[in-house]
Amino acid sequence: ASWTDVGDAVRERVPEFFDIVSIFGSPQIRHVGTIGGNIVNASPIADSIPFLMVMDAVLAIAGPHGKDRMLNINDFYLGYRKTALQPGEILTTVLFPVPTANQQLSLYKVSRRRDLDISTFTAALLLTIENETIQEARIALGAVGPTVIRVKKTEAFLKGKPFSESVMQAAGELAVDEVTPISDVRGSADFRWQLVRNVFFKFFWERRSAAAKIA
């Protein structure tokens, strides 16, 4: 599916992902570029991968012997630009659920320009929150390692904790210890470490601001 097709499919059901899709490349690129290409390119700054990782997307992979195999995207990346695709295999389908009512999803992309620019940092945070308690956390960060990564220790720390500023601050510090950013033309390692911290604050205060408006 082209990026335009993906945008049409998720516009109403996953508006957070639509916002990312809508600024991917240029209109010309979105008409011909595909989400499958973004996935198998295996770039640590790929825009679609953080979202797909926190949604536990499943990839259908076709091989030369006529039988598809299914693989969770979190098991697809083996290293920098390395995937689990075997010789003769191609990615044919990407399956992912829609966030449920009690799942809070935010997607972030930091770049020098809003449109038509390569990411300096990407992130996806999906928290299941019930009665102000975090029941589950899934967090994927891009441009802070050789692949987009799930910060598993941070996810485990958040489970069962109250959804509070202090808890999210502590989670940000834990996440910093799980990433290994480099310095390049788009940003320094220190800048990316700070972005990791900031994204947890941003997620929290987005929710508090929205709750205040409703009240």
Please tell me what each predicted stretch does.
Residues 1-215:
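C-terminal structural segment of proteins
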